[in-house]
From Swiss-Prot:
One of its GO terms (biological process) is negative regulation of DNA-templated transcription initiation. This is Transcriptional regulator MraZ. Keywords: Cytoplasm, DNA-binding, Repeat, Transcription, Transcription regulation. One of its GO terms (cellular component) is nucleoid. Belongs to the MraZ family. PANTHER family: TRANSCRIPTIONAL REGULATOR MRAZ (PTHR34701:SF1). HAMAP family: MraZ (MF_01008). The keyword Cytoplasm applies. Residues 5-47, 76-119 form the SpoVT-AbrB domain. Coiled coil: none annotated. The keyword Glycosyltransferase does not apply. One of its GO terms (molecular function) is DNA-binding transcription factor activity. Pfam families: MraZ.
Amino acid sequence: MPFGEYPYTIDDKGRVVMPPPFREFVEDGMILTRGMEGCLYVFPLASWRRVEEQLEGLPLTDAESRAFVRFFYSGANKARLDNQSRVSVPQTLRTFAGLDGDVIVAGAPGRLELWNPGRWEEAINAVQHTPPKPDLLANFVA
């Protein structure tokens, strides 16, 4: 499972170097797509297959489910690391996530996240200053 956060830069062509601890995680290819809170999710192909199975199980008759699937799938792009361990992030995804210059590459269960540093700081601060739901804490420390 990938963990940690690494500050990097995204070049003018939309390429970001994958931090060394994360390279093996995505060496067989990856899917980049829109994530929550304005970041990008980066799934290794094996994890993406599990995500697809979960999304396919959502009810087609539910408007919220359809909207979420549309949001998630329409932004998805397949990618591989180049010979300099960079991943190319499409312009539409860079615009969505506000990635221009500095970027935070963060680990999460089953995926990586690419963040605009300002949004990353806001997201981390929000967690620090908002008590988690009691159910979440009970499961976390159990």
